[in-house]
UniProtKB/Swiss-Prot annotation:
Quaternary structure and partners: Homotetramer.
One GO BP annotation of this record: L-tryptophan catabolic process to kynurenine
List of residues binding substrate: F47, I48, V49, Q50, H51, Y109, R113, T250
Catalysed reactions, as listed in the record: L-tryptophan + O2 = N-formyl-L-kynurenine
Organism this protein belongs to: Ralstonia pickettii (strain 12J)
Family annotation (InterPro entries): Trp/Indoleamine_2_3_dOase-like (IPR037217), Trp_2-3-dOase_bac (IPR017485), Trp_2_3_dOase (IPR004981)
Source species taxonomy: Bacteria, Pseudomonadati, Pseudomonadota, Betaproteobacteria, Burkholderiales
Protein name, per record: Tryptophan 2,3-dioxygenase
Similarity comment: family membership: Belongs to the tryptophan 2,3-dioxygenase family.
Pathway, per record: Amino-acid degradation; L-tryptophan degradation via kynurenine pathway; L-kynurenine from L-tryptophan: step 1/2
Cystine crosslinks: none
Cofactor: heme
């Protein structure tokens, strides 16, 4: 006798009246009801979903970056390799996501822009924490989060804590590499800047990668990550220019001009310079 239509479909469970479903597990009711357009314009939904999904990916990036930093701090490098590789692949995902937002034309964005107020991706506290964990620190960037104590404290902690790269240098110092004293203990709220003793240590690693394999692998994971981050920043600039030209950003920055300056930021300067010096 044939089962009634809808019952026993490929032996899949179909009744979730007493068990957790896919939607329950993912809290889809909350997620899919978190989009609240402020304009009547059809295209605002794209704008909201683009930024919300980016924030979800950044949540995962932070999960991986914090764990990787802890691994390096605790002298356990191998697990960090997978975590950093995952962050790079997330960045690849975010690079491709700009293609979707780029379907919004200038007139479409102009129709909804008045409804955005002063809100801007510049104010993302998760993005700011990512920048700080990667060493691009600027204490002035705490101010946009002062109105939300929990966000402010989270970002401030990242500002005042050694970056992932700082922890790598400290790891190397614990394992016999020589550094200037201020590379090991300093004001961690200051951004990473080039240091000759740091480059010398990494050059030693790169000149004998077999002997220093774990550090060599870590360094290449850093380069992979910064490479992906640079691509994301470039697509950000070109997408913004394509949609709004050189208008000022909603958050008050000079828009494309500001984003172009960010292209010059180098997160791991010694790892790039040594390629010339090898």
């Amino acid at each position: 006798m044939q089962a009634a239509q809808g019952e026993g479909w490929h032996d899949a469970q179909l009744d979730f009246s007493k068990s957790m479903s896919y939607g329950d597990y993912l809290a889809l009711d909350q997620i899919l009801n978190a989009q609240h357009p402020r304009s009547p314009d059809h295209n605002e939904m794209l704008f909201i979903v683009q930024h919300q999904t980016t924030e979800l990916w950044m949540k995962l990036m932070l999960h991986e970056l914090r764990a990787a930093r802890d691994c390096v701090r605790n002298d356990n490098l191998p697990p960090a390799f997978k975590m950093l590789a995952r962050v790079s692949r997330i960045m690849d995902q975010l690079v491709q996501a700009w293609n979707v937002l780029a379907t919004m034309t200038p007139p479409e964005y102009s129709a909804m822009r008045p409804h955005l107020g002063q809100s801007s991706g510049f104010q993302s506290y998760q993005y700011r924490e990512i920048e700080f964990i990667l060493g691009n620190k600027n204490a002035a960037m705490l101010k946009p989060h002062a109105h939300r104590t929990e966000h402010y404290e989270q970002v401030k902690a990242a500002l005042e804590t050694p970056s992932l790269y700082d922890e790598a240098v400290r790891y190397m110092a614990r394992h016999g590499f020589a550094f200037d004293a201020d590379c090991i203990e300093r004001d961690w709220s200051r951004p990473v800047t080039y240091n000759a003793s740091v480059e010398a240590a990494w050059l030693e690693v790169y000149r004998d990668p077999t002997h220093h394999w774990e550090l060599y692998e870590l360094a290449e994971k850093f380069v992979d990550l910064e490479d992906a981050f640079r691509q994301w920043r470039f697509r950000h600039v070109t997408t913004v220019e394509r949609v709004i030209g050189f208008k000022r950003g909603t958050g008050g920055t000079e828009g494309v001009g500001y984003l172009r300056k960010m292209l010059d930021v180098v997160l791991f300067p010694e790892l790039w310079k040594l390629r010339t010096d090898l």
